[in-house]
């Protein structure tokens, strides 16, 4: 049997969500329906990525340099955090669809400073309440960190993203 009940779309237009202890911003690209959802207190969302030594935009060559020391634990831990944030019903609702999670990492500490979520207004992720995204943000900031290479330390921040369907 198919559940035909309507789901609330929380993210159809630009909106600020004032929640208990935090504020989220939803920016929707007009005409494209692309949602950018993030904590309003973010430091790096929409900031230009620059080389702190030169003050210039990161070059094409610099884009391909390794910013992190090699490790094997962060990727599965990030995926686990996302999986655990969604209820069984929510996982069923978004089944077969991915959304994008972007981490903005402080190059001085290796800690995650900001987390951004990207999906479409017509995507089932638009029916997921803000509290789920907040849970992901808090858990990532608490449990994920990186060892930054000398090349990574040249940047004003490091951006790392992935697409995921919660399982």
How would you label these PLM feature ranges?
Residues 7-167:
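Charge-biased low-complexity segments
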